[in-house]
Amino acid sequence: MIEVFHAPQPPLPNHITVGAFFDRFGDQKWPILADTNPSVQALIKDASVRAYINLDDPQVLTGLQMVQSAGHDIDPPAIINAPIQPEERP
């Protein structure tokens, strides 16, 4: 009898769509998107030109911390570490 072993599948990358990224801000999404603070606008503009958001990129945490420092009640680690849902994937 021949046994066949399959190599384990590599884990999926921690990538989500730009829309899913903004949706993770919850009820803070619209105030953040409307904010004219230069730090907040920097995150919005940077995210908006991307095909997807790589949640493993340390710059994502830095950007979220800038948004938080601008006065928005968000939890950067929760936004980054929440399990990725199938509909959030690019």
Residue locations for each model-derived region?
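A preference for well-ordered globular domain cores
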Residues: 1-90
